[in-house]
Each structure stands twice: as structure tokens, then as C-alpha cells.
UniProtKB/Swiss-Prot annotation:
The gene is hscA. Belongs to the heat shock protein 70 family. Pfam families: HSP70. This is Chaperone protein HscA homolog. InterPro entries: ATPase_NBD, Heat_shock_70_CS, HSP70_C_sf, HSP70_peptide-bd_sf, Hsp_70_fam, ISC_FeS_clus_asmbl_HscA. NCBIfam families: PRK01433.1. Chaperone involved in the maturation of iron-sulfur cluster-containing proteins. Has a low intrinsic ATPase activity which is markedly stimulated by HscB.
């Protein structure tokens, strides 16, 4: 097991001889690096005295230049993206069009007279942050806690890890940005309950619902818009200034708009030469954008089951705008937590977490975490992760599974450990079978599976089927016979293969869905031929052939598109009772139900 430490407060000493780890907020617009000592956080400034370092990178005179607002911007948006995704997403393509190597089979950028992958370029920003901190602290830094958006998938997280490793960091942990912000508030203010984290950054908007209890932070829902941020507010103000005062749509006008926005966070009016704008006008201009964020936040609450919220935590410099606080209070009628600088809340949490992970102390409260994910094998060899890597323990998680084929009288359970997407690439812990189930149609049987880890790291897995009142349980020690080196290798392999694993999983899921659809429809045709004409059967068979060809081609996008085409054309082309039957099958019903 790995240990998280929560230390008792002492006098901070940022330069004392001890093990050091930093927290890094690698942002879309700006990045920060900080260190904590005895729960007091210091954000490290750059050589030109900036705490907020623009996440930009340029290459001139055979050197990388970081933070001068020139060159490649918003590289964070590219983490985990494929070349195909970039080409098919105009907003992303516009970021890299001047650098993109369209002849490559994978995403590479022509940068620094080389063809570089995204992690290799991002690593230079990590190196810059590392060098600035080492210069300030007069010591070598090798350990870091790095924050990532809650919605980042395995591929994106893997590329962040790789970039940091190239820069010379041992990544102690990746933590979600909303969790980091909540962590800062939770430690400093002993907060607990359910909180909405409203993160309006320069280029993205993220909202998360977190449950905070006794030092444990759980993200229970996320939502957002990765094309909405403080920069959009700047654009709206710029357009107003251009139209109102006949100014050119230029960088200078954009900078003027930013200055006006910042001034109006604490003054009622802004005047500069022949340009003026007051707080009321600003609020009228940006209200539609703010309302969009509120709607997204309300959707996130609905996804979480509409829990009672104890407060809203503000993250991101744009949240300094008074209108945002006012509208949030109107919408939710709860406390708005903003007394930590919203630009620094995330890096504060990362720095505090970094200190807890590396600073041994006699007066520490230890919280164990699961060092590797635990899950089980599903049909097709796919892994369903049930207890995730670095989840605090003890913990218990319940999930429901069902049978895949008709008349199945037993369910085999294969318990696995690891971060990979396919069972063959994970560590097998145990197998058992739930026998004596009543023979029923696929999908009728419901088996409730419980994964529990106690304070000693012992995993208990139990399965219970209600109809037959059948149950089975096993105990296993997941970490028996596995040392830290092997754990590190498994984690490294998971990150290294994240893209391949993710694509493999998508393909397997698409194949399973396609095969199930083909089986159901062909059985329906065989049993209900009297309800359809030959022409209708011909249309159905032709569409099924398209799906079969896609499966044979092993292309998950093609498979999904052919399934969508099937569903769409069935509705349009076949207007009989057979259409109703097929639609019911597509919703998961079986023929006996329909008859």
C-alpha cells in the first residue's frame, strides 16, 4: 500500500534540508509551481517575477522560450488527442495548423527543427518550471504532484505523465484539478460536505461536484465546456470596444479589453484615452456567457443526483468578476468560497498533497490508498475497473452485472489488478463462479458484486443473485508478492500503452455491440418472417452486411457508424410492426417480451 500523510502544523521552512516535492498546475493559459512546508504554501515566481507563467512555447535562435505569449499556445488541449481528432476539430486544428505534420501517421508537430510529439514539447514547459523552482530553492527537484482536468482520459493523463518524466520529474501523483482546489480548502478550513467546484480558466470551463469527508475527496460528477473561458470574455469586450469606439480588431485592443475587465473587478468604471466602459455595461456584455456556465453547473448537479451543496469553490482568475459570484449565489443560494486566490487554489492543493506524500513525521495521520486499480473481466476480455488506483481505503464499492447469453446458469468472475484496459495485460488475482442460476434470457439475471478493501489492504469480493438467492465470496491480498518496483513498472506500462489500450477497448466494445445486434436481428428475422416483406428483409440484411464488413475490418469508428446507420435507416425505411420489434430489440428487450 502507498501512504498519504497529513502533518501537524509547524513553522514553515522552505529551505530546510529535507526531501522536497512540488505541486504543479499545468494550465491551458497559465502554469504555476509551488512548494508547501508545514501546510504553508509558497508559489514560486519566474525569473521575471511572475507567479502565473503563460503556457506558451516558442523556438527562436536554437532555444526554447517559455511564457512570452508567442509561439504554440494551449498545448494542454492536445494531450491525449490523435491526429484524426485534431484534423476533425476546427478549434484544435487552428492551434497547431502552423506546426502540424499532416504526412505523419500519428500526431507530430514540426517544432525546433524536428518532428516532436506533444509530450516532448510539453516537457520543455515542465523543464522551465523545474529550473525556475530549483533556482529559487537552491536545490534539485525530482518529485512532483501534477494536476489534470477531471475529465482527462487515460491517454491524456499518460501524456502528462510522460512529459513530466522527460523533464526529470518523478510524478508522485496526478490529481484532478477540482480535487486539488477542494484539498486546499479542506485542509486549511477543515471543510467537509458536498461542494461544487466552479473553474473558469482562460481557455476552458470545468465544473465538478465533490464529496469531502474526513480528508477524503471524491469527484461524483463532472461537466464543462473546453471552448469557453476567460478568453471568451476578453473577446466579447474587444468586440464592444471595436464597435463602440471604432478601434481595430488587434492585439492592442484585446490587451485593452483585458485591462478593462481586470479594472472593473474592483472599480465601477474604466477610462483610457478616448475609451470608457462601466461595470454595468460589462455585466450586460458577459451575462450570456456567465449564464452558460451556470446552466452547465446545474446540469452537473443533476448528473450527481441533485445532492445538497454546502458551498461553491471558485477556481480561475475570471471568477474574480463580481457578476459571477452574484449569479452563482442567485442560482444556488449557498456560500461562495473565494478567499484563496482563485488563480492559485489548484496549485496550493497540489503543493499540500506533495508535502503530505513525502514528508515523514511522528505526528501524522496515515491514510492508505490502493496502489493499483482493482476490477474484473467482462465479456470480450475488457476490464471493468471497480476500485481505482490511489483510492483511499478502507472502501466498499457495489456494481451490478448481468448475463450475456440466453440460459446461462453460471457467471464466472475473474478478479484483476492493474491499469490496462484488457484482462490479458493485467495481473490475475482470483477466479470464482456463481453457479445454480435459473436459465433465463440474456439480461434478466442481475448479479450484485461488492468489492471491499479493509484497513489492512485485504480485498473481499462477493457476488449475490437475488432470484436464485445464490451468493459466493472470496478474500485475497492484492499486494501480496508484489513490490513497489513491480507496481511502478505496471503503472509505467499503463501510461506508455494508454493510447493503444484505449483504442483496443473501444474496438472490442464496438465488436461486442455489433455481434449482439447481428445475433438479435437475425434471430428476429428467422422467427418473425410473417411480419415483414422480402424487400424489408433485403434492406435489413444489407445493413447487417455493412456492420459485418466493419467488424471484419476491425475499425471501431466504422463499426459504430454502421450501427448508427442501421438504426437510422430502419426507422426511415421500414414502417411495419417488424420495425417496432426491431426497435424494441435495440432497446434491450427480447423476442419473448415483444410477442
Amino acid at each position: 500500500m502507498q501512504i498519504i500523510e497529513i502533518r501537524e502544523p509547524e513553522q514553515a521552512d522552505f529551505k530546510q534540508e529535507r526531501q522536497i516535492a512540488v505541486g504543479i498546475d499545468f494550465g491551458t493559459t497559465n502554469s504555476l509551481i509551488a512548494i508547501a512546508a508545514n501546510r504553508q504554501v509558497k508559489v514560486i515566481k519566474s525569473i521575471d517575477d511572475k507567479e502565473l507563467i503563460p503556457t506558451t512555447i516558442d523556438f527562436t535562435s536554437n532555444n526554447f522560450t517559455i511564457g512570452n505569449n508567442k509561439g504554440l499556445r494551449s498545448i494542454k488541449r492536445l494531450f491525449g488527442k490523435t491526429l484524426k481528432e485534431i484534423l476533425n476539430t476546427p478549434a484544435l486544428f487552428s492551434l497547431v495548423k502552423d506546426y502540424l505534420d499532416v504526412n505523419s501517421s500519428e500526431l507530430k508537430l514540426n517544432f525546433a527543427n524536428k518532428q516532436l510529439r506533444v509530450p516532448e514539447i510539453a516537457a520543455e514547459i515542465f523543464i522551465y518550471l523545474k529550473n525556475q523552482a530549483e533556482e529559487q530553492l537552491k536545490t534539485n527537484l525530482t518529485k512532483a504532484v501534477i494536476t489534470v482536468p477531471a475529465h482527462f482520459n487515460d491517454a491524456a493523463r499518460g501524456e502528462v505523465m510522460l512529459a513530466a518524466k522527460i523533464a526529470g520529474f518523478e510524478v508522485l501523483r496526478l490529481i484532478a484539478e477540482p480535487t486539488a482546489a477542494a484539498y486546499a480548502y479542506g485542509l486549511n478550513k477543515n471543510q467537509k460536505g458536498c461542494y461544487l467546484v466552479y473553474d473558469l480558466g482562460g481557455g476552458t470551463f470545468d465544473v465538478s461536484i465533490l464529496n469531502i469527508q474526513e480528508g477524503i475527496f471524491q469527484v461524483i460528477a463532472t461537466n464543462g465546456d473546453n471552448m469557453l473561458g476567460g478568453n471568451d470574455i476578453d473577446v466579447v469586450i474587444t468586440q464592444y470596444l471595436c464597435n463602440k469606439f471604432d478601434l481595430p480588431n488587434s492585439i492592442d485592443t484585446l490587451q485593452l479589453a483585458k485591462k478593462a475587465k481586470e479594472t472593473l473587478t474592483y472599480k465601477d468604471s474604466f477610462n483610457n484615452d478616448n475609451v470608457s466602459i462601466n461595470k454595468q455595461t460589462l455585466e450586460q456584455l458577459i451575462l450570456p456567457l456567465v449564464e452558460r456556465t451556470i446552466n452547465i453547473a446545474q446540469e452537473c448537479l443533476e448528473q450527481a443526483g441533485n445532492p445538497n451543496i454546502d458551498g461553491v469553490i471558485l477556481v480561475g482568475g475570471a471568477t474574480r468578476i463580481p457578476l459571477i459570484k452574484d449569479e452563482l449565489y442567485k442560482a444556488f443560494k449557498i456560500d461562495i468560497l473565494s478567499d484563496i486566490d482563485p488563480d492559485k487554489a489548484v496549485v496550493w492543493g497540489a503543493a499540500l498533497q506533495a508535502e503530505n506524500l513525502i514528508a515523514p513525521h511522528t505526528n501524522s495521520l496515515l491514510i492508505d490508498v490502493a496502489p493499483l486499480s482493482l476490477g474484473m473481466e467482462l465479456y470480450g476480455g475488457i476490464v471493468e475497473k471497480i476500485i481505482m488506483h490511489n483510492t483511499p481505503i478502507p472502501i466498499s464499492v457495489v456494481k451490478e452485472f448481468t448475463t450475456y447469453v440466453d440460459n446461462q446458469t453460471g457467471i464466472q468472475f475473474h478478479i484483476l489488478q492493474g491499469e490496462r484496459e484488457m484482462a490479458a495485460d493485467c495481473r490475475s488475482l482470483a477466479r470464482f463462479e456463481l453457479k445454480g442460476l435459473p436459465p433465463m434470457k440474456a439480461g434478466y439475471i442481475r448479479a450484485e458484486v461488492t468489492f471491499s478493501i479493509d484497513a489492512d489492504g485485504i480485498l473481499s469480493v462477493s457476488a449475490y443473485e437475488k432470484i436464485s438467492n445464490t451468493s459466493h465470496a472470496i478474500e485475497v491480498k492484492p499486494n501480496h508478492g508484489i513490490d513497489k518496483t513491480e507496481i511502478d513498472i505496471m503503472l509505467e506500462n499503463a501510461y506508455k500503452n494508454a493510447k493503444i489500450d484505449y483504442t483496443t477497448r473501444l474496438l472490442q466494445e464496438a465488436v461486442i455491440e455489433a455481434e449482439a445486434l447481428i445475433f438479435s436481428i437475425e434471430r428476429a428475422i428467422a422467427e418473425l418472417t410473417t411480419l415483414s416483406s422480402e424487400s424489408e428483409i433485403s434492406i435489413i440484411n444489407s445493413l447487417l452486411d455493412n456492420i459485418k464488413e466493419a467488424v471484419h475490418a476491425r475499425d471501431w469508428i466504422l463499426i459504430n457508424n454502421s450501427i448508427k446507420e442501421f438504426k437510422s435507416k430502419i426507422k426511415k425505411s421500414i414502417d411495419t410492426k417488424f420495425n417496432i420489434i426491431i426497435n424494441d430489440l435495440l432497446k434491450g428487450k427480447n423476442i419473448n417480451q415483444i410477442k
